[in-house]
Amino acid sequence: MSMSNSLKKLSSCVLIDLDGTLINTDGVVGDILRKYLCKYGKQWDGRESLKIVGKTPVEAATTIVEDYELPCKVDEFNSEFYPLFSAQMDKIKSLPGANRLIRHLKCHGVPVALASNSSRANIESKISYHEGWKECFSVIVGSDEVSKGKPSPDIFLEAAKRLKKDPADCLVIEDSVPGVMAGKAAGTKVIAVPSLPKQTHLYTSADEVINSLLDIRLEKWGLPPFQDWIENTLPIDPWHIGGPVIKGFGRGSKVLGIPTANLSTKDYADELVEHPSGVYFGWAGLAKRGVFKMVMSIGWNPYFNNKEKTIEPWLLHDFTEDFYGEELRLIIVGYIRPEANFSSLESLIAKIHEDREVAEKALDLPSYAKFKGDPYLTK
């Protein structure tokens, strides 16, 4: 995405947020609120997320109680909500790139502080479900250990103090606007990884805004670079989706000259939430036709300004007929780049064909080619 020209000093340590940055807390919170609010005849539709992301638990609870006009006090809400949340804590998944990032920093001896608006006990509980994470953090700071939570700089200043580092030498990684504000107020450099879609315009004060942790380039900040990119692609933990092919927007073949095979988003809503927007690749299987190389986009397609997040796979084969209704199986094995907007249709088409070339070449490599024989593709 973007990087400001204000970068002056390199970094010697990292201060990183937890909820929404390393783990998908928002997904579990949303599920609980959706059920909880029903008993009051209210409906959680996610629009309040922007108001509570990055806030302390008390601030978030106050917002919900007031905005939904709940017939209870904030402490009563919390006494009911937190047992429900604690029972679901083991279901909070790490976000793509999180495990890779913190283990890489640990391996290279980079001091890392976990600095969150959650309480210290809450932080400890959350990371206990992620094996080996606690050992990756030199310091852990919760909002109950300082005078004020984010957007106050207190949490990051305390983290830098415990690491015995000047804040100017620290790199903050944050998903929320309050977190970015806190990092800048503390005098650190800040990378924003927005956790809410289509909200990047709110993060202009950050030194850099990236799409996901998969896109972080540590060498920009004087930190040890990742060495796991292969032929301009990043191997990822494979994930599987499938379903009958349906008709899409009708622009793949007609507008772009690129026939995509669309799947119903209702069948894999969880996968859409878990995986960041961008261009991926892998293998596609049609039981009656075989297995084919595939490149696909996940996201909002900003050029066309989609209203919903979609997955649009392009099977890299010339088919002589449509195959609507046939079962399509996908194994996604690698990542190419973040989602981007384009100034013209021609530049968009050119980039899609460039992605195709990258995917076709990469899928011949043994580390990716081995997935072609996965029985999931044709069963």
Swiss-Prot record:
ATP binds at residues 248, 254, 260, 262, 315, 317, 324. It comes from the Eukaryota. It holds the Pfam family HAD_2. Mg(2+) binds at residues 17, 19, 260. The active site is at residues 17, 19, 312. Pathway: Cofactor biosynthesis; FMN biosynthesis; FMN from riboflavin (ATP route): step 1/1. It catalyses: riboflavin + ATP = FMN + ADP + H(+); FMN + H2O = riboflavin + phosphate. The modification N-acetylserine is found at residue 2. Keywords: Acetylation, ATP-binding, Flavoprotein, FMN, Hydrolase, Kinase, Magnesium, Metal-binding, Multifunctional enzyme, Nucleotide-binding, Transferase. GO terms for molecular function: ATP binding; FMN adenylyltransferase activity; FMN hydrolase activity; magnesium ion binding; riboflavin kinase activity. The keyword Nucleus does not apply. Its EC number is 3.1.3.102, 2.7.1.26. Its cofactor is Mg(2+). FMN binds at residues 337, 342. Optimum temperature is 55 degrees Celsius. GO terms for biological process: FMN biosynthetic process; riboflavin biosynthetic process. Optimum pH is acidic (5.5-6.0) for FMN phosphatase activity and basic for riboflavin kinase activity. Monomer. Bifunctional enzyme that catalyzes the hydrolysis of flavin-mononucleotide (FMN) to riboflavin (vitamin B2) and the phosphorylation of riboflavin to form (FMN) coenzyme. This is Bifunctional riboflavin kinase/FMN phosphatase. It comes from Arabidopsis thaliana. The gene is FHY.
